[in-house]
């Protein structure tokens, strides 16, 4: 009986003290650095894309931007886009990968940011060591991945223009996989 009375007193106390009269106000939106990131032609396209879909396209990003996640560690690494390939990379992404989705889909299911990287990869442990005792890892390239609030396109480099048709199809498939993976995780 004592436990029951103690439990009732605790629940009653919680109920009384949880009824605050403070007005609820929304928090300020999070900012993730400067946007747009420059004044090139593609920067204006990124602003238009943001105004239309609510998605920032970033080509300068930090490790924290790439890894920002609440529940898990992202086992990938990303390198920023090569500056001379940003326009070609964005054109490829926009014309071959994003154009297949409806505007409604892009507004509802795209992440907060698209990160343009020259390379995205994971590291696989080879269980070997070099002469100095350091672990040796094998680099496993990826072309696109998604995180909690971003999609990273990892082919914005000088090699993009020289890809064969089959390599471009594979690249489009990886991006589509990342977009659908992000959309289904929402």
Can you name each region flagged by the protein language model?
Residues 15-18:
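C-terminal motif of bacterial Sec signal peptides marking the signal peptidase cleavage site
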Residues 1-4:
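Positively charged n-region of N-terminal signal peptides that target proteins for export
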Residues 85-186:
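Acidic/His-rich structured neighborhood in mature extracellular/periplasmic domains
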Residues 6-13:
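Hydrophobic helical h-region of N-terminal Sec-dependent signal peptides
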Residues 6, 29, 138-140:
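Short, well-ordered helical secondary-structure segments
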Residues 20-104:
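Acidic/polar, low-complexity intrinsically disordered N-terminal segments immediately downstream
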């Amino acid at each position: 009986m004592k436990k029951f009375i103690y439990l009732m007193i605790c629940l009653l106390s919680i109920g009384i003290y949880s009824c605050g009269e403070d007005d609820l106000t929304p928090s300020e939106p999070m900012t993730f650095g400067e946007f747009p990131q420059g004044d090139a032609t593609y920067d204006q396209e990124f602003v238009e894309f943001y105004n239309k879909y609510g998605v920032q396209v970033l080509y300068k990003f930090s490790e924290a931007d790439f890894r920002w996640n609440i529940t898990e560690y992202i086992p990938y690494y990303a390198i920023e886009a090569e500056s001379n390939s940003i326009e070609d990379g964005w054109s490829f992404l926009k014309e071959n990968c994003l154009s297949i989705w409806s505007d409604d889909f892009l507004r509802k299911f795209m992440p907060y940011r698209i990160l343009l990287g020259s390379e995205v990869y994971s590291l696989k442990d080879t269980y070997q060591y070099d002469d100095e005792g350091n672990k040796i890892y094998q680099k496993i390239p990826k072309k696109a991945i998604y995180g909690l609030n971003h999609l990273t396109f990892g082919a914005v480099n000088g090699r993009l223009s020289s890809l064969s048709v089959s390599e471009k199809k594979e690249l489009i498939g990886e991006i589509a996989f990342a977009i659908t993976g992000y959309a289904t995780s929402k």
